């Protein structure tokens, strides 16, 4: 059996640009991509915390240290500057591999400052 698992997650990054006329993609500060193990041109899913929109695109490297999160092309209609996003990448692996897999999760402050990194998401309490 093959399972699709969370590979990397950027939690609550803020959109710094939205460029409708760029050819598509989401530009992400290279430091952020490294923190979550996201590669350039990798497929990503984006969840907009502010408006509930969910969409897929691909990552492109933004300038390292710039804190850029630029939603480009048609997806720019789904996110505005200042919106909070969760950006995820996924990986497929065997059931056996999945049972010991840990994602790379990066948590951010309101100004796109990396606050902490983790290899698990805390258990949600009732």
Curated annotation (Swiss-Prot):
Pathway participation: Cofactor biosynthesis; (R)-pantothenate biosynthesis; beta-alanine from L-aspartate: step 1/1
Cofactor requirements of the protein: pyruvate
Reactions the enzyme catalyzes: L-aspartate + H(+) = beta-alanine + CO2
Subcellular location: Cytoplasm
Residue numbers annotated as active site: 25, 58
Co-factor note (free text): Binds 1 pyruvoyl group covalently per subunit.
Transmembrane spans: none
Keywords: Autocatalytic cleavage, Cytoplasm, Decarboxylase, Lyase, Pantothenate biosynthesis, Pyruvate, Schiff base, Zymogen
Post-translational modification: Is synthesized initially as an inactive proenzyme, which is activated by self-cleavage at a specific serine bond to produce a beta-subunit with a hydroxyl group at its C-terminus and an alpha-subunit with a pyruvoyl group at its N-terminus.
GO terms of molecular function: aspartate 1-decarboxylase activity
EC number assigned by the record: 4.1.1.11
Pfam family, one: Asp_decarbox
Presence of keyword Nucleotide-binding: no
PTM annotation (Pyruvic acid (Ser)): residues: 25
GO biological process per UniProt: alanine biosynthetic process; pantothenate biosynthetic process
Residues involved in substrate binding: 57, 73-75
Recorded family membership: Belongs to the PanD family.
Subunit-level organization: Heterooctamer of four alpha and four beta subunits.
Function: Catalyzes the pyruvoyl-dependent decarboxylation of aspartate to produce beta-alanine.
Record's protein name: Aspartate 1-decarboxylase
Organism in which the protein naturally occurs: Pectobacterium carotovorum subsp. carotovorum (strain PC1)
């Amino acid at each position: 059996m093959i399972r699709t698992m969370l590979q990397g997650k950027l939690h609550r990054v803020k959109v710094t640009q939205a460029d409708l006329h760029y050819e598509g993609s989401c530009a992400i500060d290279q430091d952020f991509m490294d923190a979550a193990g996201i590669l350039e041109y990798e497929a990503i899913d984006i969840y907009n915390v502010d408006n509930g929109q969910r969409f897929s695109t691909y990552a492109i490297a933004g300038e390292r240290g710039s804190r850029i999160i630029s939603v480009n092309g048609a997806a720019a209609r789904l996110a505005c500057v200042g919106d909070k996003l969760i950006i995820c990448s996924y990986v497929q692996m065997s059931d056996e591999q999945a049972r010991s897999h840990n994602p790379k999760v990066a948590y951010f402050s309101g100004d796109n400052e990396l606050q902490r990194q983790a290899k698990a998401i805390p258990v949600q309490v009732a």
